[in-house]
Amino acid sequence: MVTDIDKQDSPQFISLNILGIGNYSLPNRVTGRELLENDSEIGYASKVDKQGDTSDVVLAMEIDGELSDLATAITHDATIKFVNGSSVEGRSILRHSTAHVMAQAVRDIWPGAKYAIGPATEDGFYYDFELPGGAHFTDADLGRIEKRMREIIKEDQSFAREEYDLAEGAGLFSDQQYKLEIIQAVGENESVVVTGDESAVVNGRNPVVSVYRNMGVHSDFIDLCRGPHVPSTGYLGNFKLLRVAGSYWRGDENRQQLQRIYGTAFESPDALDDYLKRLEEAEKRDHRRLGTELDLFHFPSEIGGGLPVFHPKGALIRTILEDFSRQVHLSSGYLPVWTPHVTKSTLYAKSGHLEWYSDSMYPPMEMEGAEYRMKPMNCPMHILVYSSRSRSYRELPMRLFELGTVYRFERSGVLHGLARVRGLTQDDAHIFCTPDQLPGELESLVGFVLEVLTTFGFDDFEAELSTRPEKFVGDISDWDLATDALASALSAAEIPYRVAEGEGAFYAPKIDIHLTDAIGRRWQVSTLQVDLQMPARFGLSYVGDDNEKHRPYMVHRALFGSVERFMALLIEHYAGAFPLWLSPVQVLVVPVSESHHDYSEEVLLRLKEAGLRSDIYLADEPLGARIRKGKLEKVPYILVVGGEDVDSRTVGVNRRGSSKPQRGVPLEDFVAEAVSVASERGGSEQDRPE
């Protein structure tokens, strides 16, 4: 085992700045747990409570910004931040620790089980397994696993971190082929990109493998892991296993098929209950189910996975979105362009996409001695529009816009209705500008994005600023300039954001804007990137006021993300009960009997003349059945037409979400109301589902 740092190498006393508490001079090698339990000066954080609610309980700490176990020895002057269960970091630690307990329970029930990786996710955790003899988990097995997990939690087993060299680490996992592969891959290639459990192997001259050991009553459990973890399993009572799904080792369909168990964990029983209620509501709102129930779209097997076919109502919603997008872009100074769906591969070789993204592209096609590809990105073609002739600074900023369909070969395991498809249409814009124009363009662009998204009834936004990754092209100074400009635009818009270090694209830093839907879920929608690399690759220039050539800056931007994904978001946000301006059928006319058909047809004609999307259900079924059908289709207005209405030129108005129909409404009054509501756009409380 790798030994600790020699005590003689450390100073006798260290200076600690404990955030939120104060500055202290303490003996060296003090641990976080000792700080909490033994130092009376550290007030509110001095007790570790093991009750069911860990919202305010310290689970781990940050030492100079690096997350660590409470058992970690602090051997140098440092800034310390304690992490409680209700923080983002605390929840992640709770979930990852619970994933370990789940793997331990599976190993206890199926002693020959192989366990692969088990990370925390935004809403929970998962772990991938291979059961002996090709066995498969059942729903009943989830209950068995949960029962064993609660026994492990009751034992209050400690999470003990241990470090080994590569050979020792491999020996610990001699019967776990997936852990061995992780250790061996990192040991053989020190430049390997580490993900998941690979980050438990610290590269360098003497690579170190970190593991966590749980001391059980009957046996120990060890797992390859970077950590940190909660001090012991007793902190982990608020969890639920959710479902079983298939997965592939390394996400590669040619590798071993595994079984993935999903679960979630929270800091308190109330937080867990709230999440499970939201999950139940999310299932009711699932756009895949509503897409079928509302006759919006489907995915024919004859066409292939990830390639949706839109039915008339779904195509109408899509058309409304696209028409709205065109309108707001044209009125904001964007210039429309159109580019083909297929292009020569050499274009994407020049842009760098072929080198970096070929695995996500459809295979090449050979035609007339040249290789062609379905386009995965619109940007190289927009660059060709810009470079089709010389440009002057007077033409800048040039904002090019296209509703362009692109094709990406997503693996079948990650396809998810309209939210993850292989053929997607982006409301794609590329802005070419001078350096002086960049800050103003970005500031107005962020404002434009938020204004458009607000039109759809969203008002809770946050952003993520992704910075330079480990593998990138271009100069660091250019990256820093672009990153600073994006950060300034977010600050000017007063939108909260976090920095995702190293998660930018290979050619540009980016902003991802997230919004919160009606049941509190976060969705990523708009993306903005400042690109200093592609203009150089394509030799773009403009003639400045000094008559010299200069290189423009280029901004990539997709506002909806994709039309398909944005439709999925809207379907789930509104549970299919779209605001009036987005509803494929805005008004449904229902005559009480055949004798009212003629007037009902007149009503229908008047509605259509007013520009309202309308339909009629004639009296070939009972009245109640037709009204119920309209409600199931979530039509905003159902007009019931009876004998009194024929004589008085009125209608009976049933508004979605209201249990009280309004009788005897003059037809023209209703038309004026509906036209006014439809023109306002947005999503009001009346538009929310019952």
What is each residue range found by the language model?
Residues 1-114, 122, 128-690:
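NTP/phosphate- and nucleic-acid-binding module
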Residues 117:
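Conserved P-loop NTP-binding catalytic core
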